Curated annotation (Swiss-Prot):
PANTHER family: PROTEIN EFR3 HOMOLOG CMP44E. It is a single-pass membrane protein. This is Protein EFR3 homolog cmp44E. GO terms for cellular component: plasma membrane; presynapse; synapse. It comes from Drosophila melanogaster (Fruit fly). The chain crosses the membrane at residues 595-612. Expression during embryogenesis is ubiquitous with notably higher levels in the CNS and brain. SUPFAM superfamilies: ARM repeat (SSF48371). The lineage of its organism: Eukaryota, Metazoa, Ecdysozoa, Arthropoda, Hexapoda. It is found in: Membrane. Belongs to the EFR3 family. HEAT repeats lie at residues 120-156. Pfam families: EFR3_ARM. Keywords: Membrane, Transmembrane, Transmembrane helix. An essential gene required for embryogenesis; required for cell viability.
Length: 834
């Protein structure tokens, strides 16, 4: 084989002139010795290379080549092919300066001729040259090739080539992101990140171009970006406001950009360009990278990364990130508690961002997933370890953060949804109690985020009734969480800390305003149920923290709902607490003392918030008397463990709160005391009937004044007389009139309840006469005799007056009838004549 050969072989000599005119593209051709024999584009290309490679590109000749390319765009592809051949030859011969000149020339041609229709053929040669430079081991060539590719990525092609492939560039740029070269590590990594950004911009804008969202590509791009981000000294101080728009700059010019900051910028751009169907393609390799490199513990980098994702993603797709992270938490249910806790913390940090875009079923779906994880955590562990407890707290915080960014009406729906998932009290196993406690803590987390305006909206019946049932739970922590939930929803004026301890002292920092009409109606309907649940809760435990929590709830209820229409019911509630302390034999002495202290503390509180001075004076007299004779009946509450063997004098009836005295205080203040005088104090374990105590809304005195017929006076009611003359026993109400409300109450009240009430009344009468002292019985009975006598005198006087009025009306009507003319003799006026 000849070392030098001519393009004109002997058999082709007759065609010499035709062959001479044709273009010669063989690099080993000898006709280059005569420039006149070479095509013009080759001569122009050759002229841009200097004699000394160190001198760089010949600018004047480059301008001629550019002008020729613009004038003859059909030659552009051949120019590119020839430059590629020359660069390949120079790279193989290690003449890197000449290869750099060739690459620079192609960059200039690309920038000048990017509007030409024949650019696609030139781009193929351009990309082949970039690939050739990237394949070489010289780092400068790699950086230069990357810069050239970045310039190409900034060009918007009118007719992109859909058969063009970028697999090699993705792989090569990803490998450059992991470079460990000692001298140029940061430069190579920056070049690799810039190259990936160029690929992203070139491909994601057109769906017909190569699908970069495929798993094989994302598994290279995303880990490469995360690898550079995690090498920052402190990722929390990485520049967060880098913009992903605008033309890319060469790596050499970006001297103030670090690989972590640039990688974060590219990740933002990648996530921001992802559509709904491509979000998971980015998240899956992200989660895999965090798992393989064990970056969940500590979770600083994971939180930072997911915040970038949530901020950069399109808002309507943010729910997908939360859903994917929850699925990953499902897949890691066998991982260590620390890993799951870190995952839950990451979830709590980002879930608030997604909450604003999650409405309707998606919001409850997230809540349901979080509750499912809580139930799984409780069911899979027999003993709650500190790590598992931290995991549960992280899930609860995530739930609270999610609910905090929803409107109040959705918070009510979330609380109702959680309440429906709490196990019933009939399930008394340890696991069910743990689950009850955990779910109620979740409910408390949501409740603390809710701003109560109207109690009717904050306590719908479907939510309040099961909550009050949980207030009677035998498990102390469960009851205390329920009390905290009630406190969070009742406290509209931030009085919870002011009323956090039982006291008889003034509350100067107490904030109060009169309740609205809707709140009063709510108290009429459900106040009795709430107070009954509080009494039952107080009787279940003698622990100071449990009793203090119940006192706090009762105090908030009084402060928020106290007014002239509700004060009598609250006084019956206080008397009920005292009655439980006096009559329930199963309670310990310390427990009874604590209940007496709570009752006097609530009495002082209601007398202050209601502004009834007579009531306050009476309460202060009891406090002073107890301070002298029985300090154990006053706050602070006694510790059962410290005073287990100590005995207390509990038979001190003269230091108890007297119902008649309370009624006199109200009457002296000009208020109606009928409900207090005739109603029975709350008792222990009384069944909740919303209509049972509804009669206290109406004034019984109105009913009595309407019963003024003679027939009512002839009817003897033995129960009324016996009960009225019995001390400490409430008087049985007269039969109500048959109006709509009375019929509704009669239908709602079961027959068994009336029988049970009758038996309790009889037992109470017998107990009073057996155990009470004679002087006490006389003292309590005498005022009632006077009251009955006065009432009878009023009735007889009213009957006498009515009889006189009736007789006078009869005489006047007869006289008028005799003077009137018959109707047939009446003459019509002329106005009605036709």
């Amino acid at each position: 084989m000849a070392l030098i050969r001519c393009c004109f072989e002997p058999p082709e000599l007759p065609e010499f002139f035709d062959s001479f005119v044709q273009k010669c593209t063989d690099p080993s051709c000898c006709c280059g010795c005569c420039s006149a024999l070479r095509p013009r584009y080759k001569r122009l290309v050759d002229n841009i290379f200097p004699v000394n490679p160190e001198d760089g590109l010949v600018k004047s000749n480059m301008e001629k080549l550019t002008f020729y390319s613009l004038s003859s765009p059909d030659k552009l592809d051949r120019i590119g092919e020839y430059l590629y051949q020359k660069a390949t030859k120079d790279i193989n011969r290690k003449r890197y300066k000449l290869a750099e000149i060739a690459m620079e020339a192609m960059d200039l041609l690309l920038q000048a001729c990017h509007a030409q229709t024949t650019l696609n053929l030139f781009v193929e040669s351009f990309l082949r040259m970039v690939q050739k430079l990237l394949e070489d081991s010289n780092p400068n060539l790699k950086i230069m090739a990357t810069n050239s590719f970045v310039k190409f990525a900034n060009i918007n092609e009118d007719t992109p080539s859909y058969h063009r492939r970028y697999d090699f560039f993705i792989s090569k740029f990803s490998s450059m992101c992991h470079s460990d070269a000692a001298s140029m590590r940061d430069s190579l990594r920056l070049a690799g990140i810039k190259g990936l950004q160029g690929v992203i911009r070139k491909t994601v804008s057109d769906d017909l171009v190569e699908n970069i969202w495929e798993a094989e590509h994302m598994e290279k791009i995303v880990p490469s970006l995360l690898f550079n981000m995690q090498f920052c000294v402190n990722v929390m101080f990485v520049k967060k406001n880098l913009l992903a728009s605008g033309d890319l700059t060469p790596v050499e010019d970006a001297t103030n950009v670090t690989p972590p900051a640039l990688a974060e910028e590219v990740l933002r751009e990648l996530v921001g360009r992802a559509s709904f169907g491509h979000i998971r393609s980015v998240l899956k390799p992200l989660l895999t990278h965090l798992d393989r490199h064990e970056l969940w513990v500590p979770n600083t980098f994971a939180i930072h990364t997911f915040r970038i994702v949530m901020i950069s993603i399109q808002p309507q797709y943010s729910y997908t990130v939360v859903e994917t992270l929850m699925q990953h938490l499902d897949n890691n249910f066998k991982s260590s508690p620390k890993t799951r806790t870190s995952l839950a913390v990451v979830l709590s940090k980002i879930i608030a961002i997604a909450a604003g875009e999650s409405v309707g079923p998606s919001a409850l779906d997230i809540i349901n997933n979080l509750l499912t994880h809580l139930r799984t955590s409780v069911s899979t562990t027999s003993e709650i370890t500190p790590e598992e407890s931290q995991y549960q707290e992280a899930l609860i915080n995530a739930l609270g953060e999610f609910a905090n960014h929803h409107p109040d009406y959705q918070k009510i729906e979330i609380m109702l949804f959680i309440m429906n998932t709490v196990p019933d009290l009939s399930k008394k196993s340890k696991g069910d109690q743990m689950l009850q406690n955990i779910l109620l803590k979740s409910l408390l987390k949501v409740g603390t985020q809710y701003s109560t305006v109207s109690f009717e909206k904050a306590f719908p019946a479907s939510f309040l009734q099961p909550l009050l049932k949980m207030a009677r739970a035998p498990h102390n922590p469960t009851r205390m969480v329920v009390m905290q939930i009630l406190q969070a929803l009742l406290d509209r004026h931030q009085n919870e800390q002011v009323l956090s301890s039982v006291s008889v002292k003034p509350y100067p920092a107490l904030s109060q305003e009169p309740p609205s009409r809707s709140d009063i109606i709510f108290t009429h309907k459900y106040g009795a149920n709430i107070m009954q649940a509080l009494i039952d809760s107080m009787a279940l435990s003698d622990r100071v923290d449990a009793l203090t929590s119940s006192f706090n709830t009762a105090a908030l209820l009084i402060v928020e709902m106290s007014c002239n229409e509700t004060v009598q019911e609250f006084l019956l509630f206080i008397l009920g607490i005292q009655q439980v302390a006096c009559t329930v034999d199963t309670l310990g002495n310390v427990h009874k003392c604590s209940l007496h202290a709570i009752s006097i503390g609530l009495l002082v509180l209601i007398s202050r918030v209601s502004g009834i001075n007579n009531l306050l004076e009476y309460a202060q007299k009891i406090v002073d008397a107890r301070r002298e004779e029985a300090s154990h009946f006053l706050p602070p509450l006694l510790e059962p463990k410290k005073l287990a063997g100590k005995t207390f004098n509990l038979q001190l009836p003269h230091l108890a709160i007297d119902k008649l005295a309370l009624g006199e205080c109200l009457q002296n203040a000009g208020m109606d005391a009928q409900r207090l005088n005739t109603g029975a104090p709350y008792s222990l374990n009384q069944t909740d009937h919303p209509g049972h105590r509804h009669s206290w809304v109406e004034s019984v005195s109105n009913q009595l004044t309407q019963r003024n017929s003679s027939a009512d006076l002839t009817v003897y009611n033995g129960d009324v007389d016996s009960v009225s003359s019995s001390p400490g026993v409430c008087k049985k109400l007269l039969a109500p009139e048959f109006n709509f409300d009375a019929m509704k109450r009669a239908l709602a009240e079961p027959t068994e309840a009336a029988k049970r009430e009758q038996r309790e009344r009889q037992m109470q009468i017998v107990r009073t006469f057996r155990e009470g002292e004679f002087d006490d019985l006389m003292r309590r009975t005498e005022p009632k005799h006077d009251l009955i006598q006065n009432r009878l005198n009023e009735l007889f006087n009213s009957l006498a007056v009515e009889r006189q009025i009736t007789q006078s009306d009869t005489k006047s009507s007869q006289l008028q009838a005799s003077n009137e003319k018959p109707i047939y003799e009446t003459n019509f006026p002329e106005l009605f004549y036709y």
